From Swiss-Prot:
MF-aspect GO terms: histidine ammonia-lyase activity
Keyword set includes NAD: no
Top EC category: lyase
Cross-link (5-imidazolinone (Ala-Gly)): 144-146
Single biological process term from Gene Ontology: L-histidine catabolic process to glutamate and formamide
Organism: Rhodospirillum rubrum (strain ATCC 11170 / ATH 1.1.1 / DSM 467 / LMG 4362 / NCIMB 8255 / S1)
Keyword Transport listed: no
Gene that encodes it: hutH
Protein name listed in UniProt: Histidine ammonia-lyase
Amino acid sequence: MTEPLCLTPGGLSLDVLRRIHREAPPLTLDPRSYAAMAASQAVVAAIAGGESAVYGINTGFGKLAHKRIAPADLEALQTNLILSHATGMGAPIADATVRLILAIKAASLAVGASGIRAEIVDALLALANADVLPVIPSKGSVGASGDLAPLAHLCCALLGIGSVRHKGAVLPAGEGLAIAGLSPITLRAKEGLALINGTQVSTALALAGLFEIERAFAAAILAGALSVEAVMGSHRPFDPRISALRGQFGQIDVAALFRLLLDGSPLNAAHQGPSCERVQDPYSLRCQPQVMGAVLDQMRFAARTLTIEANGVTDNPLVLVDTGEVLSGGNFHAEPVAMAADQLAIAASEIGALSERRIAMLIDSTISGLPPFLVAEPGLNSGFMIAHVTAAALASENKSLAHPASVDSLPTSANQEDHVSMATFAARRLGDIAANVTGIVGIELLAAAQGLEFHRPLRSSQTLETAMAMIRERVPSYRVDRYFAPDLEAIAHLIGEGRFDALVPVDLSTLGSV
C-alpha cells in the first residue's frame, strides 16, 4: 500500500505535489489546521448573524455585490452560487489532475483564511482517498475570478449533484458520496464562494503539464546524447569551461548532464583523434546546452511559481482571524499561473523543435554519414522517412499551441471582471504540447538508436548502452519496413512511464547548481 501523505497547509513541496499526481497516496491533514479553520469560520458566523454587509457572506456576487441578502437566505445563496456557476464544457479533466485539485484546494482552505468548516475540507480529502473524483469539464474558466466554473463542478459533487468517476466508471454524485462515506453537504455562509474562488484548477493543470514535460525533457537530453554518438559528433561543446564563461545556470547543468551520459564512450574515443574532421557540428547538436539549458531555466521558474501558488490562499474575500477583518482583494487572479504556463509552453515547444532538427539530421546521409533514412536497403525500404514527417507535424502544431494565452483578455461579469488571465487554457494546453514533444523525442530515440547500431561493434558509454537496452526491450531494431505506428506508441509510453528519469537526474527545485 502507498505510504499516506500528510498535507501541511503552506508546506507542499514540488516533490509532494508530484507524488500526489503520480502515486495517488492516501491523504491526511495536519491536525494543527483544525484550530485555524474553526477560528476563521467563527468570524464568518458572527458576521452572518450581524448587521454589517460584508461581500461574499451576506451579499450577492460580482456585479451584484451591492445586493444585501437576508440571513434566512444565506444557505440558499451559497447553493445558488454553485448551481449557477457550474457551466463548464468540454472533455473531463484527467483523474490524476482532479485528485491534485482536491488536495491543493483542501490545503488552501485549511490555512484558515477562508471561513469554511473543517468537515468540508475533510470531505474533499475523503473523495480523493476513496477514488471518487468529481467530473470536471476542462473548459469554461478564464482564470479570474478564480476557476469558477470548474470548481463549481467540483463543489456540486459535495452537494450530491452532477457526476463523479470511481474506478473508471461514471456515477451519479450521490452514489459517489455514499462510496466515500459521505452525505450531501449543506453550505453555510461564504462556504460556496470559498470553494469556487481560487486558482487550484489552473495550478493543478499547469503542474500536471510540468510533470509530463519534465519526463520529456529527460528523454530529450538522452536522445540528444544518443544522436551525438550516432553521427560521431564532438563532445567538446559540453566542456564545462564553455558554460562557466557564460554563467547561465541551466546551461551549466545541462552540459553536466551530457558529460554524465557521454563519459567513457569507446565510440567517441575511436574517432576523436588528430585526424578527426569534425570541427563544428550543426547547432542542433552543438548548442544543446544553450537551448536545453534555457528550457531548464524556464521549467525551474514555472516549478517555483506553481509551488508557491499551490501553497497560497487564492480565495476572496479573505478572513483575518487576528483582527476579525474580512478583506476583499484579488488573489483569485491567476496571472502568475498564466505567465508561468506560457513560458513553459514556449520552452517545451523548443524541446520538440530541437529534437525534430536532429531527426532530420540523422536521416540525411549527407550530414549524418549514416544510410539514407536509417535503413540498410533504402529505396526498397523507406525507413524513418515518414516518421520524421510525423515529428515535423507535431513540432509545427506546437508552434501554434505555444502562442501566449496571457496576452489575451475578455471582460466578463458586466465589466466588473474587466481583466482576466486565461490561465486555465494556458495550463490546459500544456498537456497537448507535452504529448507532442513526447512523440517527437520518442522518434528521435528510435532514430538515434538505429543510427548507433550502424557503428557496431563499437559501443557508446555505459549509460547510453543501458538506454539502448531499454529501448530495444520495447522496440526491436528496424531492419526492413514494417507497421511503424506501434513502435512510436511503445517508445512514447516508455518516456511517459518515466523509465529514463533515473538516467538523467533533473532537479527542478533549485534555480541552478552554482
